[in-house]
C-alpha cells in the first residue's frame, strides 16, 4: 500500500502471492502514472524496498528515496494505523469463502480504496481526495508513458557466454552473436521480459528466452570483434 503523506490518499495498492521488489515496482509505477511523481519516497528496510534497482528507478524519476530506521515502529505510524483501519473496516468484514481468485480480491481492494479516499477523515478535516486535489503542491506528471516505462527498467550487467546466452534470475536468454564474450548492459521490466534488450551505443538489441533445441543447432560467427567498444575484454 502506498499513501500520500499530506492527504492520506491511498495512491497505490494491490495484493500478490509474493512480497518482492518486482511487485512493489509494479504498484509504484501505477501510482505514479495516476497521481504523479512524489518528491520523496519513504519505505521500509525490507528487501522489497531496499535494493539497487529501486534506488536507480528513483534516480531516474528524480525522487529522493528514504528508508525508515531499523526497529523504529514510530517512523511507520501512519502506515501501521492505516493497515489497522484496513483490517477492521474491510478485511474482517469480507466473506472470504465467496472470494475465488486473486483478481476478485484485488477488485474488492480497489473498491475499498475508492471508498476510503472519498470518506471524511477527522484527522485532516476533509476527505483524502479533496485534500489531495486542494493541495498547492501537486506532484510532477511523467513526461510520457514511454518515459515512465524507461525509468522503471531494471538495469544489470552480464557477460555473454560462448553459446551467445546470458542468465537473468536463473532463466537463460539468447543475445545477438556479436556480443559473445562481451560484458553487456541489460534493460528489462521484471513483469514483461519479452521487452528486454541490450543497450549499446544508444541502440536496443532485443533478447529472448532461450529455446535449448534451437540454440544448440545455431552456427556461431567467428568474426573478430573489438570487445573494448562494448565493455568486454580483448
What function would you assign to each model-found segment?
Residues 9-10:
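Hydrophobic "anchor" residues
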Residues 13-37:
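Active-site beta-loop-alpha junctions of metal-dependent nucleic acid enzymes
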Residues 34-51, 69-71:
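Acidic/histidine-rich, metal-coordinating catalytic segments
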